[in-house]
Amino acid sequence: MTKFGFLRLSYEKQDTLLKLLILSMAAVLSFSTRLFAVLRFESVIHEFDPYFNYRTTRFLAEEGFYKFHNWFDDRAWYPLGRIIGGTIYPGLMITSAAIYHVLHFFHITIDIRNVCVFLAPLFSSFTTIVTYHLTKELKDAGAGLLAAAMIAVVPGYISRSVAGSYDNEGIAIFCMLLTYYMWIKAVKTGSICWAAKCALAYFYMVSSWGGYVFLINLIPLHVLVLMLTGRFSHRIYVAYCTVYCLGTILSMQISFVGFQPVLSSEHMAAFGVFGLCQIHAFVDYLRSKLNPQQFEVLFRSVISLVGFVLLTVGALLMLTGKISPWTGRFYSLLDPSYAKNNIPIIASVSEHQPTTWSSYYFDLQLLVFMFPVGLYYCFSNLSDARIFIIMYGVTSMYFSAVMVRLMLVLAPVMCILSGIGVSQVLSTYMKNLDISRPDKKSKKQQDSTYPIKNEVASGMILVMAFFLITYTFHSTWVTSEAYSSPSIVLSARGGDGSRIIFDDFREAYYWLRHNTPEDAKVMSWWDYGYQITAMANRTILVDNNTWNNTHISRVGQAMASTEEKAYEIMRELDVSYVLVIFGGLTGYSSDDINKFLWMVRIGGSTDTGKHIKENDYYTPTGEFRVDREGSPVLLNCLMYKMCYYRFGQVYTEAKRPPGFDRVRNAEIGNKDFELDVLEEAYTTEHWLVRIYKVKDLDNRGLSRT
C-alpha cells in the first residue's frame, strides 16, 4: 500500500464523504452569511420584539424557570401589568438559557446577550441539514444538497434569522421542517416511533411560535387528501392518530396554548380528520365482514347519521361559545380585507400587509422560476410524501400573498421544490452529455435523430450554472444591504460614499435610564415599548404585545388630540414623559408622523375615541399634508407639536427654508408655537428621538411649571 493508500476509498465511501463535505459547507455558509450586521456594527439585538425576548431570556437565565413562569411584569402596560409566563411561547427563551447553562457548565464563559445574538444563525445551520434530509425523502441526495445550499442563502429566510434577530421565527422554521421530515418518515414507514418523534418535534414547534397552527391544519389536510385519492392505509392511520393524540396532549402543556387544541376553531380540522380516520378504519372493518349490498346500506346510513350529529353538535358548541371563533389574524388570512375593515391594530403592522409582486423576486429570485418545475415533477411522480409537499407549497404560496410575514413559511418549500426542479433538469441533460472527444466517435455512435444532443445538454447545464451563480450573488447582496441593518442603529451613505451611523435610539434610551426617576412612566406609540423597557428600564403604557386594544386606543387618542385634551388623558394614565420618533431632519421615513394616521384610526376605534375622525386630519381634497395647506386639526394636535417643536428654526437642506421636512418634502405649516402642557426634556443628536416631560398640575392662579 502506498503512503496515501488511506485515500483510496470505495465509491460508496467517496460518495458519502462528498455529500458530508457539501452539506457541511452549506451549513457553515448558512451561519457565516448571517453575520454581516455583527461585522458591520457590533453584537447587538435587532428590531423591536427581540428586545422583549432578550429581556425575558436574561431573566430566565438569572432567576430560573420557576420565577420566570410566575413572573408578573409591572414595567409593562401600566397600570395593568402583564403576566409573562402565561402569555408567551417559551421555546426560544428556554433554548437560549439551556445553551447558556451548558456552555457555562463546560466553563465556556459567554454573555447571555451573545447567545441570543447568534442563536438564529446557529439554527439556520440546523435548518440546512434538515432541509437536506427532507428533500432526500422526496427525491434523492442530489436534490437534497441543492435544496440545502439554496436555503442557506435564500433572502426570504435570512430576513428573520440574521445575527441579532432574536425572534421566535429564528428557531421555529427549523422546528417546522423537522416536524415535516418526521411526518414524512412516519407516513412512509407507518412506525409509531417516527410518529412519536414527529409529535415531539411538533411540541417544540408549539413552544416556539404561534405559526404552529399552520402545521396542525396542513397535516390533517394531507391525510384528508390521501383519503379522497384512495391512498389512505394502515400506515397513515397509525402515523396520524399517534401524532394527533400525543401532539395535542404535549401542546396543551404550554401555558399560553392551554386548552385551545380542543376548544378553538383553528384546531377543529385536526380533530375532525382524527374522527374521520376512526370512521374510515371502522368502515374498512365492516367491508371485510359484510357483503357489498349490506355494506352499501349500512355505510350510507352511518355516514348520514354521523354527519348530522357532527354538524348539530358543532353548531351548538359554536353558538354557546364552547368552541372559540377564529382570531382576527386568522380571519385576515382567509379574508385579506377583514383586518383593514374591522381591526386597525392588526392592519397597522407592516408585516401584516399583503405581499407585492416585487417582493417575491427580491426574496426568492431564481426559486420563483424553478418552483413550478419541482411542482411538475412531484405531480408527475405522485407519492404520499410528494402530495404533502405539493400541498405545503400551494397553501404557503396563498398565505404568503395575503401577509408578507408568511414569506418566511414559503421560502423553505420554494427551496425544496426548486432543489428538486434543478436536480431533475441537470439529471436529464447530464444523461445526454457525452464527454468523449468528437473526433474519436464513429458515425454509428452518433444519434442521427438528435445530432446536436451534446451541444444542447452542455448549453442547458451552463445556463443552469449561470442562474445558480446569479442567485448566490443576489442573495448575498440582499442579505448585506437589506437585511443586515439593526433598526436600533441606523446607517446611511454620505456624499463621499462613507457610512454615517445614527445611534439616536440607544442615546435616548440611555438618557431615560440615567436621567429619569425609576418609577417614571413613559408614553410612546406601541412600536417602541419593548425597546424602552429593555434598554431604558422604565415603565411603559403600551408595547408590541398589543393585547389590549382599548389601552392602545387611549394612547392614540392622546397623540391625536389637542394639548388640553391630551393632558387630561396623560394625567389619567399618570404619564411622566412622552417619547416620539421624528425623521424630518435625517430623512428617516418610519417616524411617528408617517404612522400617525394609524394612531388616529386606532384611537377612534373605541367608544372613548368616537370623536376622533380620520377625515378631520385630511385637507378638503383628501390629502395628508404637514405644510400650510394641512388640516388645522392636524397642525394643532399633540403629535404634530411634539415632532415639530423648534423645528421651524432649523435648516435641513441648502436652498430650502427653515423647517423643511425631508421625509414629507414640505415646509411645515405651523412653526411659531410653544408647548403648554409639556416641556422639552431631551432631543438626540440627529433629532430622531424627542422626549418631553409632562408638566405638573396648575397651582391656583399660577401657570404650569
Curated annotation (Swiss-Prot):
Residue span of motif SVSE motif: 348-351
Annotated glycosylation sites: N537, N544, N548
Expressing tissues: Expressed at high levels in placenta, liver, muscle and pancreas, and at very low levels in brain, lung and kidney. Expressed in skin fibroblasts (at protein level).
Keyword Hydrolase listed: no
Binding site residues for Mn(2+): D49, D167, E169
GO cellular component: endoplasmic reticulum membrane; membrane; oligosaccharyltransferase complex; oligosaccharyltransferase complex A
Activity regulation remarks: STT3A, but not STT3B, is specifically inhibited by the N-glycosylation inhibitor NGI-235, which prevents productive binding pose of the glycan donor in the active site of STT3A.
Binding site for dolichyl diphosphooligosaccharide: R405, Y530
Result after altering R405A: In LLO mutant; abolished oligosaccharyl transferase activity due to defects in binding lipid-linked oligosaccharide
Lumenal topology ranges: 39-119, 159-169, 207-211, 260-267, 322-356, 403-406, 474-705
Reaction(s) this enzyme catalyzes, per UniProt: a di-trans,poly-cis-dolichyl diphosphooligosaccharide + L-asparaginyl-[protein] = N(4)-(oligosaccharide-(1->4)-N-acetyl-beta-D-glucosaminyl-(1->4)-N-acetyl-beta-D-glucosaminyl)-L-asparaginyl-[protein] + a di-trans,poly-cis-dolichyl diphosphate + H(+)
Gene3D superfamilies cross-referenced by the UniProt entry: 3.40.50.12610
Top-rank EC class of the record's enzyme: transferase
Gene Ontology biological process terms in this record: co-translational protein modification; post-translational protein modification; protein N-linked glycosylation; protein N-linked glycosylation via asparagine
Record's disease association: Congenital disorder of glycosylation 1W, autosomal recessive: A form of congenital disorder of glycosylation, a multisystem disorder caused by a defect in glycoprotein biosynthesis and characterized by under-glycosylated serum glycoproteins. Congenital disorders of glycosylation result in a wide variety of clinical features, such as defects in the nervous system development, psychomotor retardation, dysmorphic features, hypotonia, coagulation disorders, and immunodeficiency. Congenital disorder of glycosylation 1W, autosomal dominant: A form of congenital disorder of glycosylation, a multisystem disorder caused by a defect in glycoprotein biosynthesis and characterized by under-glycosylated serum glycoproteins. Congenital disorders of glycosylation result in a wide variety of clinical features, such as defects in the nervous system development, psychomotor retardation, dysmorphic features, hypotonia, coagulation disorders, and immunodeficiency.
Family that this chain belongs to: Belongs to the STT3 family.
Biological role: Catalytic subunit of the oligosaccharyl transferase (OST) complex that catalyzes the initial transfer of a defined glycan (Glc(3)Man(9)GlcNAc(2) in eukaryotes) from the lipid carrier dolichol-pyrophosphate to an asparagine residue within an Asn-X-Ser/Thr consensus motif in nascent polypeptide chains, the first step in protein N-glycosylation. N-glycosylation occurs cotranslationally and the complex associates with the Sec61 complex at the channel-forming translocon complex that mediates protein translocation across the endoplasmic reticulum (ER).
Oligomer and partners: Component of the oligosaccharyltransferase (OST) complex. There are 2 OST complexes, OST-A and OST-B, which contain STT3A or STT3B as catalytic subunit, respectively. OST-A and OST-B contain common core subunits RPN1, RPN2, OST48, OST4, DAD1 and TMEM258, and OST-A contains DC2/OSTC and KRTCAP2/KCP2 specific accessory subunits. OST-A complex assembly occurs through the formation of 3 subcomplexes. Subcomplex 1 contains RPN1 and TMEM258, subcomplex 2 contains the OST-A-specific subunits STT3A, DC2/OSTC, and KCP2 as well as the core subunit OST4, and subcomplex 3 contains RPN2, DAD1, and OST48.
Protein name as catalogued: Dolichyl-diphosphooligosaccharide--protein glycosyltransferase subunit STT3A
Name of the gene encoding the protein in the UniProt record: STT3A
